[in-house]
Amino acid sequence: MSKSNVTEIEEEKQIESSIVQHFICQVSKKNHDAMLQIAKQANEIARKYGALRVEYFQLSSTENMIDWTNISKTVSANQDEEEVWMEQVFYRDSKHRDEYTAMCGNDENMNRLYKQFMNLIIPGSAIVGEFSRLKV
C-alpha cells in the first residue's frame, strides 16, 4: 500500500469519527515500560471491539506557549519523576462508544489490564474528557 493510500485511509477514519475521549494520567518514570506493555495489549483488544483509532502520547514539552498554560502545570506533574500520558479513543458516535465500552467492560483481559493500569499510575491523576467533532 502506498503512503498516499495509507494517508487517505487515515483521513477517512478521522472523518467518520465524531467523538473522541481523552484520558490523561501521570505515570512514574519507573513504570514506563510496564505501561507500554499494557497499552499494546489494550490496543489489540480495542481494535477487536471496533474502536476507530486508539492513540497514546507522552507529554514532550512543559513550556507555556504565548498566553497558553502548559498542561504540565495543570496536572502538577513532577517532571523529574513522572510522565504525563494521554490516550485518545475515537468513535463514530455515542452509540458506537456505548457499544464499545460495554464490550470492553465484559472482557476479562481488558478488566485485568485496566486494574494493572490503575495500579501503575499516580493515584488521583486520572482525568477524562469526551469531545464531539465541530463542523467548521
Where do the protein language model's features map onto the residues?
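Short amphipathic alpha-helices in soluble, non-transmembrane regions
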Residues: 36-42, 100-108
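Amphipathic alpha-helical interaction segments
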Residues: 46-49, 98, 111
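Glycine-rich beta-strand-turn "strand-cap" elements at beta-sheet edges
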Residues: 1-15, 52-80, 105, 109-136
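Short, well-ordered beta-strand segments in beta-rich or mixed alpha/beta enzyme
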Residues: 20-27, 66-105
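Positively charged, small/polar-rich N-terminal and surface patches that mediate targeting and assembly
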Residues: 33-36, 41, 47, 53, ...
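A short, structured loop/turn motif at beta-sheet edges
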Residues: 48-49, 92-95, 122
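Surface-exposed interaction/gating patches
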Residues: 7, 11-34, 38, 49
